[in-house]
């Protein structure tokens, strides 16, 4: 019995040491702010706001009743009218975008100062994935919406970590999902993807949508294992994506795990910034 309790204490001590190491690591890490991606998001919101009508709001008393009044192009619309209700939604949406833009501009001023470069602007970029020699699909928001989240039927018992409605296979995947969620980047986890040359689907770790470019990116997260078999699987994934017309570090980017070391999200942030910035120069 004494040996049993000694064993339990050793396990708890080991877990405590790992937790302390993790906390110390997290305290050391400073957030990496992706400069080009931040500029793209700011210019995207500025463009959206510029395209929206300038709606102002005030109040008036009509027959003893206070009503919200919306003014656009010097014309007045009451909130109980059809147009007034539409303008109310437009006013709320515009206000939300302005608040989001203010936060991003504050981050820019805090870390970079100066003018936001205007050449890093939103636009539609066309990239294609080949599902067969004669079947190509554009990697845009329509493609993204057709993907099913968490579609991989294999080894579901290994998904034991829960975050935001989905079970993940590793702590690093949870951190990646949290990163995308908190940064407002839509993503699908392990969606089913058909690639040219394959008779079976693959399940990418993450497919993300860059709304500002209407463009999808594939993100594979690998464990760094000293295993020849694992390395062969990794090499096969590289080749499968290339055979479907996807370029490494442009259409597909990769991150890696190191045993015993918490995944550093600065790595993901740097990679993401790089593939987005490179995409801006695609003709």
Language model: regions and residue ranges:
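Solvent-exposed, charged helical/coil patches
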Residues: 118-186
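Active-site metal-binding core of divalent-cation-utilizing nuclease and nuclease-like domains
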Residues: 166-168, 181, 186-212
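Short, well-structured alpha-helical interface segments that form or flank functional binding sites
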Residues: 171-175, 198-201, 236
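Acidic-and-aromatic substrate-binding clefts and catalytic sites of carbohydrate-active enzymes
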Residues: 193-201, 227-228, 258-263
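Basic, glycine-rich
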Residues: 243-283
């Amino acid at each position: 019995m004494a040996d049993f309790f000694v064993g339990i204490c050793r396990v708890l001590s080991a877990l405590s040491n790992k937790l302390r190491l993790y906390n110390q690591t997290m305290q050391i890490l400073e957030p990496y702010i992706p400069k080009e991606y931040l500029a793209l998001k700011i210019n995207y919101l500025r463009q959206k706001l510029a395209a929206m009508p300038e709606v102002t709001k005030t109040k008036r008393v009509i027959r003893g009743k206070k009503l919200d009044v919306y003014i656009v192009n010097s014309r007045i619309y009451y909130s109980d009218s059809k147009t007034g209700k539409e303008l109310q939604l437009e006013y709320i949406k515009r206000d939300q975008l302005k608040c989001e833009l203010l936060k991003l501009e504050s981050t820019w001023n805090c870390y970079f100062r100066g003018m936001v470069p205007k050449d890093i602007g939103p636009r539609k970029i066309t990239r294609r994935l080949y599902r067969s020699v004669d079947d190509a699909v554009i990697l845009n928001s329509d493609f993204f919406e057709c993907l099913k989240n968490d579609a991989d039927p294999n080894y579901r018992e290994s998904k034991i970590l829960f975050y935001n409605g989905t079970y993940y296979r590793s702590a690093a995947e949870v951190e990646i999902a949290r990163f995308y969620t908190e940064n407002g980047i839509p993503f699908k986890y392990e969606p089913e993807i058909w690639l040219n040359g394959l008779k079976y689907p693959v399940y990418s770790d993450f497919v993300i949508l860059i709304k500002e470019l209407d463009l999808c990116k594939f993100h594979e997260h690998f464990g760094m294992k000293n295993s020849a078999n694992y390395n062969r699987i990794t090499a096969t994934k590289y080749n499968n994506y290339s055979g479907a017309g996807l370029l490494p570090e442009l259409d597909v980017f990769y991150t890696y795990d190191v045993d015993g070391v918490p995944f550093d999200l600065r790595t993901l942030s740097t990679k993401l910034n790089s593939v987005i910035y490179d995409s801006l120069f695609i003709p």
